[in-house]
């Protein structure tokens, strides 16, 4: 999910245009799979580039923080660290309570949308991922 487009449907920011700007490239919108464009990067820098970062922190957000952000119309970014190394970014766009569990609505550019328990998301997302960083967004 594009956070920039969430806040402004007329935003010109796309994943490839952010990559071009952040990495000093000009061709990522033509062929984003090149080694010059397909690079690990920092979500805080990308969200700062688009003007959508409020703050970020190492670790997870509490359900109270998630509720507060979603009720305010502000999705959260989450970094997933894989047990084998590397990372991945997803967006949290909703929540719901189902006693005794809390569920969150996650948008993932690879795995799509999912409704997942907060406990599972925190420690075993897609079996081998754990939530390592939280990114608070703004319009």
PLM regions: where:
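Active-site nucleophile-adjacent alpha helix/oxyanion-hole segment immediately C-terminal to the catalytic cysteine
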Residues: 1-26
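Conserved active-site-adjacent core of cysteine acyl-enzyme catalytic domains
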Residues: 17-139
């Amino acid at each position: 999910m594009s956070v920039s487009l969430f806040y402004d449907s007329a935003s010109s920011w796309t994943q490839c245009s952010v990559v071009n700007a952040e990495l000093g490239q000009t061709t990522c919108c033509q062929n984003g799979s090149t080694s010059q464009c397909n690079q690990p990067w920092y979500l805080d820098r990308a969200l700062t580039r688009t003007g959508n970062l409020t703050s970020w922190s190492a670790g997870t957000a509490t359900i109270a923080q998630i509720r507060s952000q979603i009720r305010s119309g502000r999705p959260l970014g989450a970094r997933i660290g894989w047990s084998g190394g590397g990372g991945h970014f997803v967006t949290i766009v909703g929540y719901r309570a189902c006693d005794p569990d809390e569920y969150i609505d996650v948008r993932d550019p690879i795995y799509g949308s999912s409704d997942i328990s907060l406990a599972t998301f925190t420690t075993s997302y897609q079996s081998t991922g754990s939530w390592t960083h939280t990114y608070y967004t703004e319009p």
